Amino acid sequence: MLKPLGDRVVLKVEEKEQKVGGFVIAGNGQAATKTAEVVAVGQGIRTLNGELVSLSVKEGEKVLVENHAGVEVKDGDEAYLLVSEANILAVVE
């Protein structure tokens, strides 16, 4: 399993199949954002005083992330997205 460092977050992106006029559009088409599940979070970042500030998101939460953010990584057969917490726009409740 991947263990992110600092303010990074490992996400499992939800692939949604979209249809337009009977044709299937691969991936998210032209969407500006995508929905993902938080799989793992880093320990946080340190302030100038050395205090550790933990991340705002937790494992298991669904989040909205910028479409072109992060780096795609593989762990075995599974594909994940590694992003900085700043690229996460909202928690989906």
UniProtKB/Swiss-Prot annotation:
GO terms for cellular component: cytoplasm. SUPFAM superfamilies: GroES-like. SMART domains: Cpn10 (SM00883). It comes from the Bacteria. GO terms for molecular function: ATP binding; metal ion binding; protein folding chaperone; protein-folding chaperone binding; unfolded protein binding. GO terms for biological process: chaperone cofactor-dependent protein refolding. It is found in: Cytoplasm. InterPro entries: Chaperonin_GroES, Chaperonin_GroES_sf, Chaprnonin_Cpn10_CS, GroES-like_sf. Keywords: Chaperone, Cytoplasm. Heptamer of 7 subunits arranged in a ring. Interacts with the chaperonin GroEL. Belongs to the GroES chaperonin family. PANTHER family: 10 KDA HEAT SHOCK PROTEIN, CO-CHAPERONIN GROES. HAMAP family: CH10 (MF_00580). Together with the chaperonin GroEL, plays an essential role in assisting protein folding. The GroEL-GroES system forms a nano-cage that allows encapsulation of the non-native substrate proteins and provides a physical environment optimized to promote and accelerate protein folding. GroES binds to the apical surface of the GroEL ring, thereby capping the opening of the GroEL channel. This is Co-chaperonin GroES. It comes from Streptococcus sanguinis.
